[in-house]
Structures are given as structure tokens and as C-alpha cells.
């Protein structure tokens, strides 16, 4: 009896193939099916289990036995096309339903050699996704301008205008009346050219200063704008307020996509050797029951035939 599980385990290693994948959303129903290659043998039993150690069901024809708290309300079983295909449907998917599902066929030859048992195994990976793949895009697309002011009375806005060149994809426009400066941003420093004196200065860490909010429009994540004149400095800082964005766009119902590698806590820890041995024992019990039934039927029918023969004589 101990040789049968070892034989079935070796056969399962031979038939091992890369697992195909199917992807569904939370709340949907997922139908997983597999078909056997050996169509000449008779299927004694089929089984479904989930890695690593969770047996879902054992099925012999229309009789289905569930394990590990699985029920037909959660997982329904079907075996159409004369046991050529076995199918399960997982209803109302949750994140815990994701993982690798394995189906197995236990087959015997149609000849009198009932000791030979063939075994085929196939695996399918189920991925459960959420509905919030675009959440990060929504958060990154918004920006909230935040401004403060320093020494506005020292700024001379007469007869000058400002033109800004920024290395970010979208330009920043500052509508300060009648002054002209050119500011070029690099990665960590800001170069400012003074229109009145022609001198160039570099600010390593600019102070967060701003003009009036209604006088300019900023559409960027983080940017600094510095205008240097003869009498003062004005700097505009535009940042993205993460707290406000999460208040606006964050939804408790939307969660980043989740892919579960496939682990399920079960009441008992099963190994491949254990359930293969269970399958073998069950197969022998079924075959023994069939043999007992045939012997009983033969004995019961033998006596009436003998009685009829004696009456004829």
C-alpha cells in the first residue's frame, strides 16, 4: 500500500507543467476547468485542492465530498463530457480566494488489470484584482497652490515684466505687472538674473515665498519662482497637498491591486502523500464494494436457477 502513493507522486512530477493564469475582480465568479489527456482509461475519482495544503473536494461521478470548510454554496462542481473535463466555480471572490488550484484525475484501465492506477494533475493560478488601478493616477494629476508673501511693499512693479522658463512639462505663469526677469530651474538650485543690474545669483535652498493667489496659476507638483529686483525678492512655491488630495480622491472602497500568492489556513495540514494515500484507500474500498456486490448477486441468482432445473427433471 505504501508503494501506491510513491508511484502517484512520481507520476505527478512527470506531468508537471507551467500553471496557466486567470484574472478576476473581487465579487465576481471564477470558473476553473481542466481536461485529461488520457481518454482511454476510466475515471475512478477526480479531486480539487488548493496549494499549499488545502483539499477542496473529492468527486466520484455525481457524488461530491467537500473538505476544509468548503461548501457547495461557495464552490460548485461539475464534470461534463463523460468525465473528460472537471470544472469548479468559485462564487463571490475575495482576496483570500486567490492562489494556485490543482485538479487531479485517478484512472484505471478498461482491461482486467485493476491494480494499475493512472494519475494526471493540472494547476491553474487564480489572480483576484480590485477596481482601483487608476487611484494613483488620480492622486498624481492634482495640485494645490499654496502661497505666502514677504515684503510686498518693497517690490517695484513699474515698467518691468517676467518671463519664466521651467524644465518641468507644464509652464508656470506669473502675471506680475510690468517686470521682466528670466529664471531657469535646475535639479537643486535656482539661477536668477537681475534685470536692473545684470548680475546672476544662485539660491541653493529657496525660501517659500509667494505672490497673491489670484494673480498667477500654477499646475505642477512642486515649483519655485524667484523674481529679483532692485528693492526686494518675491518667491512663489506651489506644492501638492497630500492631505487634501487624499481627502478628495481617497476612497475606502478602492484598494491598490492585490495579488495573493496562494496560501490558505486549513484545519489540518495535508501533504501530497497524505491525500494521494486517501485517494488510493478510497479507490480500493470502492472496488471491493463492487466485487462484493457482484459475488452476492451471483450467489442469489444461482439458487433460483438450480431450483428451476430440479423442477424440470
Swiss-Prot record:
The keyword Membrane applies. InterPro entries: Ig-like_dom (IPR007110), Ig-like_dom_sf (IPR036179), Ig-like_fold (IPR013783), Ig_sub (IPR003599), Ig_V-set (IPR013106). The chain crosses the membrane at residues 275-295. It is found in: Virion membrane; Host membrane. Glycans are attached at residues 37, 69, 112, 159, 194, 252. Residues 296-313 are intravirion. Residues 1-16 form the signal peptide. Keywords: Disulfide bond, Early protein, Glycoprotein, Hemagglutinin, Host membrane, Immunoglobulin domain, Late protein, Membrane, Signal, Transmembrane, Transmembrane helix, Viral envelope protein, Virion. It comes from the Viruses. Residues 17-274 are virion surface. Induction: Expressed in the early phase of the viral replicative cycle. It is a single-pass type I membrane protein. Gene3D superfamilies: Immunoglobulins. SMART domains: IG. SUPFAM superfamilies: Immunoglobulin. Glycosylated; contains phosphate and sulfate-substituted glycans. O-glycosylation is required for hemagglutination and hemadsorption activities of infected cell membranes. GO terms for cellular component: host cell membrane; membrane; viral envelope; virion membrane. Heterodimerizes with OPG040. The heterodimer OPG185-OPG040 interacts with components of the entry fusion complex OPG143 and OPG094. Heterodimer with C3/VPC protein; disulfide-linked. Belongs to the orthopoxvirus OPG185 family. Prevents cell to cell fusion by interacting with and directing the viral OPG040 protein on the host plasma membrane. The OPG185-OPG040 complex associates with components of the entry fusion complex (EFC) presumably to avoid superinfection and syncytium formation. Via its interaction with C3/VCP protein, protects the infected cell and probably also the extracellular enveloped virus from complement attack. This is Protein OPG185. It comes from Monkeypox virus. The lineage of its organism: Viruses, Varidnaviria, Bamfordvirae, Nucleocytoviricota, Pokkesviricetes.
Amino acid at each position: 500500500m505504501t508503494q501506491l502513493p510513491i508511484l502517484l507522486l512520481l507520476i505527478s512530477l512527470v506531468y508537471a507543467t507551467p500553471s496557466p493564469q486567470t484574472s478576476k475582480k473581487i465579487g465576481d465568479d471564477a470558473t476553473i476547468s481542466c481536461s485529461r489527456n488520457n481518454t482511454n482509461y476510466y475515471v475512478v475519482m477526480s479531486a480539487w485542492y488548493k496549494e499549499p495544503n488545502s483539499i477542496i473536494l473529492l468527486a466520484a461521478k455525481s457524488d461530491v465530498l467537500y473538505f476544509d470548510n468548503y461548501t457547495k454554496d461557495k464552490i460548485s462542481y461539475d464534470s461534463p463530457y463523460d468525465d473528460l473535463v472537471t470544472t469548479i466555480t468559485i462564487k463571490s471572490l475575495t482576496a483570500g480566494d486567490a492562489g494556485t488550484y490543482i485538479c487531479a484525475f485517478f484512472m484505471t484501465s478498461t482491461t482486467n488489470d485493476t491494480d494499475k492506477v493512472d494519475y494526471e494533475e493540472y494547476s491553474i493560478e487564480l489572480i483576484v484584482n480590485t477596481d482601483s488601478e487608476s487611484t494613483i493616477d488620480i492622486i498624481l494629476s492634482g495640485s494645490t497652490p499654496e502661497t505666502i508673501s514677504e515684503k510686498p511693499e518693497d517690490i517695484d512693479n513699474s515698467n518691468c515684466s517676467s518671463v519664466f522658463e521651467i524644465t518641468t512639462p507644464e509652464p508656470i505663469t506669473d502675471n506680475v505687472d510690468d517686470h521682466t526677469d528670466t529664471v531657469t530651474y535646475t535639479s537643486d538650485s535656482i539661477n536668477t538674473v537681475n534685470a536692473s543690474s545684470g548680475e546672476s545669483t544662485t539660491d541653493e535652498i529657496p525660501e517659500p515665498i509667494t505672490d497673491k493667489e489670484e494673480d498667477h496659476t500654477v499646475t505642477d507638483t512642486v515649483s519655485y519662482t524667484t523674481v529679483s529686483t532692485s528693492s526686494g525678492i518675491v518667491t512663489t512655491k506651489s506644492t501638492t497637498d497630500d492631505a487634501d488630495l487624499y481627502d478628495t480622491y481617497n476612497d475606502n472602497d478602492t484598494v491598490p491591486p492585490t495579488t495573493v500568492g496562494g496560501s490558505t489556513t486549513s484545519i489540518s495540514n495535508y501533504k501530497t502523500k497524505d491525500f494521494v494515500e486517501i485517494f488510493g484507500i478510497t479507490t480500493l474500498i470502492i472496488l471491493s464494494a463492487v466485487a462484493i456486490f457482484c459475488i452476492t448477486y451471483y450467489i442469489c441468482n444461482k439458487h433460483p436457477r438450480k431450483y428451476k432445473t430440479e423442477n424440470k427433471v
